């Protein structure tokens, strides 16, 4: 729960109430974090139970045994600390470029949040140190690739945990420092790991959940931009507004479908460009629009419904105990299970990728319609500028090539990672989630979609320019103005690269999300 302290916004974590919005605020706005006192007491109770079980000489997986296929080897009591340090060192084996700071901050936040549930058997100093580093903006070096998503994100989280031991390295103010230097920045000494603490640190789903959560947040902004693009395109071709009538969507009762229709009605309210059966003759021109316009609520509705389902899954995961074994303080038990398994996240992120790919697919179809003189209702072929001659000038012909290339790439990336298990650890871990793969490809799919929607916005704005913008609706007028502040109309052929990049930045930063939100709020 966020608290204001002067200009600083401080977020309290308790292991149970973290939300997507709060995670994004910590990851990207650097909001400070504090741990709820009751949550710290839970960690103390959980640690006490583990220590009692060890005094009773109980055999506990990963605490006094080896790991994975080596779990049949018993470890002597005098070697339990070394076992945990060895685990983190040996499993810090990821490769590639380091994660961006927002992903790392999200990972740190999520790991601290799950540890304070009291089911991991760690001392409170561990999550407290993670939060201290987070608040100081000291970000451990975590390479992107190396996790199969079961047993959790072992390798990336091991890289994060090395810094707590004074090992590895971290980024601070855009320079790399050693693990020991990182700890000095927060006035701490290296942690000497006790029994189970290494396993508690690296056994969880925080990498895939962090990447997926940040991508989902950006996907909501993308979705609003796609609605803005659809509305502007609808006006640009002088399309029919009747398919968005509330009565049609009330008969099917899918919430996303109704939401999209509502948003488009709000965006084009007052439009003199859209046609309606009330005032226009269907015999005058085309009586129906192509599916990419007419069926947009039925196509985009399932996308936003899927995103909402993904959000629910991710927020459950944010507040879950995801390591193994788990301590149950009230019963005094320690049980081995599989909460580290990333299948719920993997399948959710595959679904998100599929939904986003669909969003881009239908956007590309509208781009094609806007450029096609047989479909764009009287505009020039490829929206050649007024001062140019079709044939001599190509207009926006080539932007569809780019959109098509991006959509084709997404069709490859939309293949589900969750269906591609490869056994690991001597076939002991014989079914893994590949959740990190689903997360990574969702990043690529998202960026491709942002570009495709940016291209549709560019194309629709040019079409509106050629037709005349005086009749735009209440919301689309603001969409058009936002584009025109960045990109001038196409009068004669020029490179469209810079234009696309400028609109891409508007999409990425949520400019159209703000327009749609304010509009719908005002309509309600």
Spans of features found by a protein language model:
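Well-ordered mid-protein domain cores that form the structural environment of catalytic cofactors
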Residues: 117-135, 139, 150-154, 174-195
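C-terminal auxiliary extensions adjacent to catalytic cores
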Residues: 6-31, 35-42, 46-54, 80, ...
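FAD-binding core of FAD-dependent oxidoreductases
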Residues: 61-75, 79-83, 90-113, 143-165, ...
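Cysteine-centered functional microenvironments
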Residues: 142-147, 330-334
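Glycine-rich, flexible loop motifs
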Residues: 6-57, 84-143, 216, 234
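Polyanion/phosphate-binding surface patch
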Residues: 58, 73, 260
